[in-house]
């Protein structure tokens, strides 16, 4: 005998929001200088995804365990993009759809190397899910391991400001990707971000950190609401 669930219970925006999941994706194995942990991207994305789930009632699906990266960016351990999609992302979404009866999902990306946006249409068709790719964290946090990311980490309690004086590219070339010559030569946007970090340095700011996190959470909430409209039309 099936138990009837109280879908209208709790502080949720709609009982239909249970049909929407939120999955975080980020890198767990990537250098971020001495003041941030190697899984900074995954932790920031997980916070944003969970906070949006708490505020809307959407299902929190956790965090993907792997990430992809451009071949010329060498600051961590990553996997091929197609392998990431086929072996990691698809199985997680397929299982969530089956076990939780999902109809839609927001994927919250916290890692610039996860260039998966152009895979979403194929994923939607194959999995039978409406999918929103949310890249807001990457869009607004600025250079890799720079002021924005460090400031967000400060708010989350994962930054060690005792090591701030060590945050120089001569010791940690991944900061701003300043010392990653191959990446800067291959990618104009990476070089632009590195120049910003060279000019401005790394300066933690709790106001900036909170603004980045709040902006990212609101962006995911907006995606949840848009997906809710779509699934309610069916």
Curated annotation (Swiss-Prot):
Q: What cofactors are annotated for this protein? A: Fe(2+); Zn(2+)
Which reaction does this enzyme catalyse, per its entry? 2-amino-5-formylamino-6-(5-phospho-D-ribosylamino)pyrimidin-4(3H)-one + H2O = 2,5-diamino-6-(1-D-ribosylamino)pyrimidin-4(3H)-one 5'-phosphate + formate + H(+)
What GO biological process terms does the UniProt entry carry, in alphabetical order?
F420-0 metabolic process; riboflavin biosynthetic process
Q: Which GO terms describe its molecular function?
A: 2-amino-5-formylamino-6-(5-phosphoribosylamino)pyrimidin-4(3H)-one formate-lyase activity; ferrous iron binding
Residues engaged in binding Fe cation 2? 32, 41
The entry's keywords: Hydrolase, Iron, Metal-binding, Zinc
> For this protein, what is the EC number?
3.5.1.102
Which NCBIfam families does the record match to this protein? Answer: ArfB_arch_rifla
Q: Describe the function of this protein.
A: Catalyzes the hydrolysis of the formamide of 2-amino-5-formylamino-6-ribosylamino-4(3H)-pyrimidinone 5'-monophosphate (FAPy) to form 2,5-diamino-6-ribosylamino-4(3H)-pyrimidinone 5'-phosphate (APy).
- Protein name as catalogued: 2-amino-5-formylamino-6-ribosylaminopyrimidin-4(3H)-one 5'-monophosphate deformylase
Q: Which species is listed as the source?
A: Methanothermobacter thermautotrophicus (strain ATCC 29096 / DSM 1053 / JCM 10044 / NBRC 100330 / Delta H)
């Amino acid at each position: 005998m099936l138990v009837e669930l109280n879908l209208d219970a709790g502080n949720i925006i709609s009982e239909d929001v249970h049909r929407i999941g939120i999955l975080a994706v980020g890198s767990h194995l990537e250098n971020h200088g001495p003041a941030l942990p190697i899984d900074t991207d995954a932790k920031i994305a997980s916070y944003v995804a969970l906070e949006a789930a708490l505020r809307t009632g959407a299902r929190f699906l956790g965090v993907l365990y792997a990430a992809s990266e451009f071949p010329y960016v060498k600051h961590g351990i990553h996997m091929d993009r197609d392998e990431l999609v086929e072996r990691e992302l698809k199985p997680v979404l397929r299982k969530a759809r089956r076990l939780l009866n999902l109809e839609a999902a927001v994927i919250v990306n916290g890692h610039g190397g996860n260039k998966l946006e152009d895979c979403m249409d194929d994923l939607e068709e194959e999995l039978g899910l409406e999918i929103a790719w949310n890249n807001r964290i990457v869009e607004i946090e600025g250079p890799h391991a720079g002021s924005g990311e460090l400031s967000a980490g400060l708010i989350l309690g994962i930054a060690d400001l005792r090591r701030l004086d060590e945050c120089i590219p001569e010791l940690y070339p991944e900061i701003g990707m300043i010392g990653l010559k191959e990446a800067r030569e291959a990618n104009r946007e990476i070089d632009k971000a590195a120049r910003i970090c060279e000019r401005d340095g790394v300066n933690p700011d709790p106001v900036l950190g909170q603004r980045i996190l709040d902006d990212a959470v609101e962006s995911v909430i907006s995606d949840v609401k848009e997906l809710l409209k779509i699934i309610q039309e069916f």
